[in-house]
């Protein structure tokens, strides 16, 4: 009798332990991370995912999201599309019972390759500052979110800035602009809209491709020297950026007439070019720096506690790192908002999608988050999965970036018909019936 009772007690204890483990896993919200920490784009990957992970750790250190702790795991993609797809399939179903909230590959190629999969799996695909521009139209792309800045908004804002520097958009007529772009889906994304802007404003556009990864550009810069453009727009990535700046110096093209895009704007893009980078201008959706309350909180609760993700602590507060923090804020806010509708518990990707689509970050909320000045005000909706569309311009002084402009807004009214036409074409090709956003709730 005693033996049977003991065995029953042991069985109950094992059962309770298993239940407790499962409950713990089920009480967490999972973020699958298709990261890249090796290869020619490792600087971007390590900085971005370092900031993202440190923000998740910071949230956990302060109680999680309404008591729900966050968990994550990484799968190395090396920025290779095929590996990114493999990682997506490996991670999409969650971890130990914790459901996946969203996928954040930080790669246009991987985003394109997993778009249909994420839609079928009802898992939000977050492409902050990049991705398919037409995925801004949430009526056709319910699960894709090019948060803050889509590629068309990026180049529209750059042209608007060049117009400001020229005395007005009407003064662009007759100007010569070269776009030097990375030979990838990301690099080619804006060619069509740049030509449309050239036709509208009367400037001459020259498009020059740099093959991946971008460490050989001599012929392109010789062409630029012959063309004598007024401005060069650099749509680079990774090693391509410092090579471009050094190549420009060799042919005598001034750095302060080169404008880097959103992936040509980090310390890792400018510093390796040395003196050739001084004066270089780029856009940004967020500044570098460590003085924001949220970054100070991360330093206190995560980094000073010995739990920071960065291998090199000097990268704390850099452009790539802070973008990861911004991305963390937006992902966690979507979860928090969705919890207000569906309950303070781990949520499905479909439920988190609702949170992303209803994101509204005004100055009051950004101040509460300690991110005022770090994140631009955003408001998303069924029809608008971008929510921002503004950039600031910064200039490299040889050691650091300095902001040189206020917010410059893209011409979203001009871009919207182009976006909708592309989205409708995609819908027709895929047999998608667009949602009626007037009935979205």
Predicted regions and their residues:
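Venus flytrap/periplasmic-binding-protein-like
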Residues: 77, 125-127, 132-136, 213, ...
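Segments of small-molecule ligand-sensing domains
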Residues: 308-321, 332-406
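Extracellular/periplasmic periplasmic-binding protein-like sensory domains
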Residues: 141, 248-328, 408-411, 422, ...
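Sec/Tat signal peptide C-region and signal peptidase I cleavage site
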Residues: 19-25
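Bacterial N-terminal signal peptides
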Residues: 9-18
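Bacterial N-terminal signal peptides that target proteins for export
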Residues: 1-10
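Beta-alpha junction/loop-to-helix N-cap segments that form part of ligand/metal-binding clefts
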Residues: 27-30, 43-53, 57, 62-138, ...
């Amino acid at each position: 009798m005693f033996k049977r009772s003991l065995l029953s007690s042991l069985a109950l204890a094992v059962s309770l332990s298993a239940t407790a483990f499962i409950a713990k896993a089920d009480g967490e919200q999972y973020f699958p991370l298709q990261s890249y920490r090796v290869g020619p784009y490792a600087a971007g990957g390590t900085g971005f995912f370092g900031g993202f992970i440190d923000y998740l750790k910071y949230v956990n250190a302060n109680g999680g999201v309404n008591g729900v702790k966050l968990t994550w795991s990484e799968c190395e993609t090396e920025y290779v599309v095929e590996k990114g797809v493999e990682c997506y399939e490996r991670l999409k179903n969650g971890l130990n019972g914790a459901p996946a909230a969203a996928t954040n590959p930080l790669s246009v190629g991987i985003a394109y390759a997993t778009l249909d999969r994420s839609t079928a799996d009802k898992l939000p695909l977050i492409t902050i500052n990049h991705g398919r521009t037409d995925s801004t139209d949430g009526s056709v792309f319910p699960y894709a979110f090019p948060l803050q800045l889509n590629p068309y908004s990026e180049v529209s804002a750059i042209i608007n800035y060049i117009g400001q520097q020229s005395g007005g958009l009407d003064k662009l007529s007759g100007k010569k602009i070269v776009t030097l772009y990375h030979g990838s889906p990301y690099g080619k994304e804006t060619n069509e809209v740049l030509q449309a802007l050239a036709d509208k404003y009367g400037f001459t556009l020259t498009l020059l491709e740099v093959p991946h990864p971008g460490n050989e550009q001599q012929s392109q810069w010789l062409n630029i020297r012959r063309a004598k453009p007024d401005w060069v727009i650099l749509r680079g990535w990774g090693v391509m950026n410092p090579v471009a700046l050094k190549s420009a110096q060799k042919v005598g093209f001034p750095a302060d007439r080169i404008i880097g895009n959103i992936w040509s704007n980090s310390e890792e893009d400018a510093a390796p070019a040395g003196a050739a980078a001084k004066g270089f201008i780029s856009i940004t959706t967020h500044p570098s720096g460590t003085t924001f309350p949220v970054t100070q909180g991360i330093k206190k609760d995560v980094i000073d506690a010995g739990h920071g993700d960065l291998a090199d602590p000097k990268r704390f507060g850099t452009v790539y790192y802070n973008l990861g923090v911004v991305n963390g804020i937006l992902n966690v806010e979507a979860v928090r908002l969705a919890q207000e509708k569906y309950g303070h518990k781990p949520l499905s990707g479909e439920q988190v999608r609702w949170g992303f689509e209803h994101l509204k970050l005004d100055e009051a909320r950004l101040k509460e988050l300690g991110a005022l000045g770090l994140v631009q005000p955003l408001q998303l909706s069924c029809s608008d999965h971008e929510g921002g569309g503004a950039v600031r311009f910064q200039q490299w002084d040889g050691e650091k970036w300095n902001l040189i402009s206020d917010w410059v807004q893209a011409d979203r009214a001009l871009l919207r018909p182009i976006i909708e036409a592309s989205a409708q074409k995609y819908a027709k090709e895929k047999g998608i019936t667009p949602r009626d956003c007037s009935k979205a709730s």
